């Protein structure tokens, strides 16, 4: 009976003695031996609540007890004892509440203990981050939308995420999973209605009917005002929970204890925001705890209670003139319907509108709870709205071109109590991406602080130039410090005041502590603390109501050419661009993997530039360098290096600026980094060198630090501007078998003299991949100068050629064929490689013959000639027939060399810089003879705009590769 009595549910308000008795009994019954670093694997009954007790303070414990009492209220007056399952559910909910307040992930802790109770072994889940993509389309989508189009967007986003992860975030490879949550198209009815209101809707043939007569900004406002909107939010919550439960049951989600991030597009972002806000309040948590769930720290909610008397009381008076939404929340007077015209009474659905008003109030119940606490006896009450809630806690929330700012502005107009201060989504951080020309998007920061309309949004770094970030700080505290004159008291610059703005400096001082708590708790760098300490007094008032510790508005690059497009076409273009944008994907990866705030120790010999982009750039050693490099683009390159296992390892790089190497980087620091363990993704800092007068550095890896057999990415980073050159160091065992391909001779099907892309011979990629699959090392060789490396590598990457070592001539040479022969001979003599097959044109026959290759191993693409018929094998029928012959006969076999060398199979990574090829100043010779197509003629304009370039002279689509540069003799370079 004593045991049953302990399990019985206490009456309301009697939770405190029950929990105190448990604590006392635990302290009495516990043994004298204490193990502070050990924790029981089995958490049963009362012990489950004590998990992590050392992380709580006394105030949290009192709040836990009050929360437990409220969790027990729905169980009745204690007429029946509480079952063990109900008790475990209460304990689980209590533990989740405590974790939310501490900003710890709530999944996995209690669930792991439950698995242990059942005797199931613990499994380590490889998924660390779950990205739930809420895809609702853009505001112009009609009907339910094409499911195949939504699935195609998710597939595109997943493929871009994988490529970027492989290229620059290898440590995250396989640990981030994307799941698709379809959302209803809530704007379809509004779009249909507004389209019928077009003044030219009766005349389809009229030219003006195709103009911009659709008020795009009104569509989301009409959509969220519909009484059916709450059903859409409930549907999204249900679908997200279903996807999450299926994920937990799958092989990728067993034992999952990572973070869950939400990504919402134009329409999905609206639904996701309301779902997050609703999940914070109505069920399970008290209003106080629910508002903390999405806040930065628990102390930030104190100002809400302090100012509610002045802010919300004034909102009661202001809301009298609006639609009768907040009247049901008044305590003093009953609800009175607004006087309406007689013609409106027959079509005005009062019940539906009241239900919708209750839904709006329930979303932000944490704000309006104090205003409505206990209605007067006999007074009207809003109907109960139950939409469910997320089964998971949201870590980061990313918005893609969402009109959420307009929606919140409308709601704040209708319900003045729903100001940015109180409306706090239940997540750690909100990121809102948008293009400045996107008619669907709007800013959010001016809603939280009106003065932010004078602060530009954060520019998302271009992935091609800064794949790991450009070093700018995203912290709100740093932004306030940078623009401190704007936020000083009395410098409002005619900005409208907030409803909850403090009336006097003493009130502002009450917000100082929450702001400091947020800055210190969210940032791991010393710069944020110093910035916060230097912030003005009013900064703490802003940080107390902010949705996270970082900036919220992020602007993506938007080319000026889009101004020529019709406005109604822009939502489709921009919506498609988010799923393909490597800028967005790289930014999300940096935030999710916390690459922005990693502390690097020089003693660990890690890469401060790669792993901590927030570090400031160093000044140039020479004053003239900054002047020389003005308005020129970096054209750095580092040679791929092949070294023998027991031989020297020499890294060579050249750092030039301008399209024709007009400026050399002289006398400046360059960091040399190598990824010694490619699977870990960690860059190791080898050394720092100074460039010579020609912009070159040569670094001989010391013997103690030489690398073993394998392929290692190498990066050379310029200290002054963080530009870099990428290459590979390959350490081979003796006798490694290779296959050589001449890029121009074997791959290019046309000679480009007009600036267009060289065509690829059909089947060429398949033949290269065939040799790679057999284990051979691929060598790409060309007589072109190394200044064209970025362009050639980007062309190979664009056509998915397998990964291999690429070798160029050292500058402009008189006889490129002789240079080829010398280079290959040195590889054979110094690195002890064996060439098993060689491909090229008729000009390469002499090169391969000098190396001693038999005719059976030389494959020439082109028409047979009697002169060379006995010196090579002509592939007159193309690569497709040749590949079939290789697979059918025994001409190709797996390599016989040392099995210690296992080459990674794959294509060229995204470190190639395709924007290098499309810049107009690189194509001066060809622009005068070839006019680009107008934007309207682009068959896939949305794809073309997904990765716009950072310079204004990239407005028109230019060829991705032009090889018509250099001396005239280069037209015949093999």
UniProtKB/Swiss-Prot annotation:
Tissue: Detected in brain and spleen, and at low levels in ovary.
Keyword flag Calcium: yes
Membrane topology category: Peripheral membrane protein
Protein keywords: Calcium, Cone-rod dystrophy, Disease variant, Lipid-binding, Membrane, Metal-binding, Phosphoprotein
GO MF term set: calcium ion binding; lipid binding; phosphatidylinositol transfer activity; phospholipase activity; receptor tyrosine kinase binding
Spans annotated as Disordered: 284-304, 323-346, 491-536, 927-974
GO annotations of cellular component type: cell body; cell projection; cytoplasm; cytosol; endomembrane system; membrane
Main localization, broad class: membrane
Domain DDHD: 390-594
Stored InterPro entries: DDHD_dom (IPR004177), HAD-like_sf (IPR036412), HAD_sf (IPR023214), LNS2/PITP (IPR031315), PI_transfer (IPR001666)
Signal peptide positions on this chain: none
Illness the protein is tied to: Cone-rod dystrophy 5: An inherited retinal dystrophy characterized by retinal pigment deposits visible on fundus examination, predominantly in the macular region, and initial loss of cone photoreceptors followed by rod degeneration. This leads to decreased visual acuity and sensitivity in the central visual field, followed by loss of peripheral vision. Severe loss of vision occurs earlier than in retinitis pigmentosa, due to cone photoreceptors degenerating at a higher rate than rod photoreceptors.
Function: Catalyzes the transfer of phosphatidylinositol and phosphatidylcholine between membranes (in vitro). Binds calcium ions.
Protein name: Membrane-associated phosphatidylinositol transfer protein 3
The species this protein was found in: Homo sapiens (Human)
């Amino acid at each position: 009976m004593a045991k049953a009595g302990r399990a019985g549910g206490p009456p309301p308000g009697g939770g405190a003695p029950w929990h105190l008795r448990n604590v006392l009994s635990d302290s009495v019954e516990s043994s004298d031996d204490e193990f502070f670093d050990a924790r029981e694997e089995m958490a049963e009954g009362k012990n489950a609540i004590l998990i992590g007790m050392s992380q709580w303070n006394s105030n949290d414990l009192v709040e836990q007890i009050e929360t437990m009492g409220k969790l027990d209220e729905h169980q009745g007056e204690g007429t029946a004892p509480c079952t063990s399952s109900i008790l475990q559910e209460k304990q689980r909910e209590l533990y989740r509440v405590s974790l939310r307040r501490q900003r710890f992930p709530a999944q996995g802790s209690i669930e792991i203990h439950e698995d242990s109770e059942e005797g199931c072994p613990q499994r380590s889940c490889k998924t660390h981050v779950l990205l739930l993509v809420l895809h609702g389309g853009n505001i112009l989508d009609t009907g339910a939308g094409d499911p195949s189009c939504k699935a195609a967007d998710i597939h595109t986003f997943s493929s871009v995420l994988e490529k970027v992860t492989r290229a620059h975030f290898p440590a995250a490879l396989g640990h981030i999973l994307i799941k698709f949550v379809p959302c209803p198209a809530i704007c379809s009815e509004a779009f249909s209605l507004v389209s019928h209101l077009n003044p030219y809707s009766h005349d389809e043939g009229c030219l003006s009917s195709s103009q911009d007569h659709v008020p795009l900004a009104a569509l989301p406002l009409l959509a969220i005002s519909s009484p059916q909107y709450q059903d859409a939010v409930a549907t999204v919550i249900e679908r997200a929970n279903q996807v999450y439960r299926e994920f937990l049951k799958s092989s990728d989600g067993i034992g999952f204890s990572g973070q869950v991030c939400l990504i919402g597009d134009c329409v999905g972002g609206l639904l996701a925001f309301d779902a997050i806000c609703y999940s914070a309040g109505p069920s399970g948590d008290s209003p106080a705890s629910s508002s903390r769930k999405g806040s930065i720290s628990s102390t930030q909610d104190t100002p809400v209670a302090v100012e509610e008397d002045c802010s919300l009381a004034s909102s009661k008076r202001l809301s009298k003139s609006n639609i009768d939404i907040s009247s049901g929340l008044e305590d003093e007077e009953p609800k009175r319907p607004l006087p309406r015209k007689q013609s409106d009474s027959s079509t005005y659905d009062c019940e539906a509108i009241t239900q919708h008003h209750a839904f709006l109030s329930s979303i932000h119940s944490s704000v309006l709870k104090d205003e409505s606490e206990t209605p007067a006896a006999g007074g009207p009450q809003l109907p109960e709205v139950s939409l469910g809630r997320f089964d998971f806690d949201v870590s980061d929330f990313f918005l893609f071109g969402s009109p959420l700012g307009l929606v919140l502005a409308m709601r704040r107009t209708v319900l003045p109590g729903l100001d940015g201060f109180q409306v706090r989504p239940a997540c750690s951080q909100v990121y809102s991406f948008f293009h400045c020309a996107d008619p669907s998007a709007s800013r959010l920061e001016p809603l939280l602080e009106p003065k932010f309309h004078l602060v530009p949004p954060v520019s998302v770094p271009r992935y091609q130039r800064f794949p790991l970030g450009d070093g700018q700080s995203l912290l709100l505290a740093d932004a306030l410090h940078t623009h401190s004159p704007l936020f000083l008291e009395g410098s409002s610059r005619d900005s409208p005041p907030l409803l909850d703005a403090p009336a006097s400096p003493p009130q502002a001082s009450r917000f100082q502590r929450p702001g400091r708590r947020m800055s210190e708790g969210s940032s791991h760098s010393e710069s944020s603390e110093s910035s916060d300490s230097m912030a003005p007094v009013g900064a703490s008032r802003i940080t107390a109501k902010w949705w996270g510790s970082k900036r919220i508005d992020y602007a993506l690059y938007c080319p000026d050419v889009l101004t020529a497009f019709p406005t109604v076409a822009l939502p489709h273009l921009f919506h498609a661009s988010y799923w393909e944008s490597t800028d967005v994907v790289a930014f999300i990866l940096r935030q999710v993997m916390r690459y922005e705030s990693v502390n690097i120790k020089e003693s660990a010999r890690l890469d401060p530039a790669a792993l901590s982009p927030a570090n400031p750039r160093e000044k140039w050693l020479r004053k003239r360098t900054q002047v020389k490099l003005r308005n020129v683009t970096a054209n750095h390159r580092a040679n791929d290096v092949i070294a023998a296992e027991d031989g020297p390892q020499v890294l060579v790089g050249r750092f030039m600026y301008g399209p024709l190497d007009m400026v050399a980087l002289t006398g400046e620091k360059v960091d040399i980094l190598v990824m010694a363990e490619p699977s870990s993704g960690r860059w190791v800092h080898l050394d720092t060198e100074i460039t010579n007068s020609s912009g070159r550095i040569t670094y001989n890896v010391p013997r103690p630090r030489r690398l073993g057999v394998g392929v290692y990415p190498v990066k050379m980073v310029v200290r002054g501007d963080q530009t870099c050159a990428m290459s590979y160091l390959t350490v081979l065992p003796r006798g490694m078998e290779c296959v050589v391909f001449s890029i121009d001779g074997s791959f290019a099907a046309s000679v480009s003299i007009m600036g267009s892309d060289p065509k690829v011979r059909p089947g060429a990629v398949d033949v290269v991949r065939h040799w790679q699959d057999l284990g051979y090392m691929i060598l790409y060789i060309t007589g072109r100068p190394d200044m064209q490396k970025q362009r050639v590598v980007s062309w190979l990457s664009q056509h998915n050629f397998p990964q291999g070592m690429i070798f160029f001539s050292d500058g402009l040479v008189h006889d490129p064929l002789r240079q080829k022969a010398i280079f290959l001979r040195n590889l054979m003599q110094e690195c002890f490689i064996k060439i098993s097959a060689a491909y090229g044109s008729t000009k390469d026959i002499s090169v391969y013959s000098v190396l001693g290759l038999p005719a059976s191993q030389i494959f020439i693409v082109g028409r047979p000639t009697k002169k060379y018929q006995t010196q090579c094998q002509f592939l007159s029928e193309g690569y497709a027939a040749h590949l079939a012959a290789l697979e059918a006969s025994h001409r190709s076999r797996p390599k016989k060399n040392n099995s210690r060398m296992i080459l990674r199979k794959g294509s060229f990574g995204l470190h190639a810089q395709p924007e290098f090829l499309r810049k107009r100043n690189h194509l001066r010779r060809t622009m005068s003879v070839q006019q680009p197509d107008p934007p309207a003629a682009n068959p896939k304009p949305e794809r073309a705009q997904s990765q716009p370039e950072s310079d204004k002279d990239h407005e028109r689509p230019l060829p991705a590769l032009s090889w018509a540069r250099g001396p005239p003799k280069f037209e015949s370079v093999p």
